Amino acid sequence: ILMAIQLKNDDDLSRMRIAGQLTRQVLDMIGTHVKPGVTTGELDEICHDYIVNSLQAVPAPLNYRGFPKSICTSVNHVVCHGIPGDKRLKNGDIVNIDITVIKDGFHGDASRMYPVGKPQIMAQRLMDTAKECLELGISVVRPGARLGDIGSIIQNYAESKGFSIVREY
């Protein structure tokens, strides 16, 4: 089912920007807590407390379609939407933390990949390539740009580096 794109007014854009900025603040804050020995459940608790109490926002994933936590933590080979729990991070792991906050009716949604200690060579290549894909995608965003064209640039670059994109989850 295709949904029509709804144009936003200046107030909507301002509130969207704020939601995005709050999401970035959570990602910046949690990075200092990503280290060997911490559990993904502990990272979830830290983020939940920060989102609710410091930012006065709502963690969107919590109870969404039965999702039991406030963030998603995808460790190593988990592609996306990993559920935080008792798993302890260890040196060499990589963890993607996906944050979505709701503030004043708008969602801010972003994720960031963090190395735990010193990442293995392939993990570092993955993180570097993902960042380069992000930068390439952003570089072609402009009025009139088509989502398919942006995705194609990202896919082609990822595949040229020996990686693939997620088609379904």
Residue ranges and their predicted role:
Residues L2-Y169:
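Active-site neighborhoods and metal-handling regions in enzymes and metal-associated proteins
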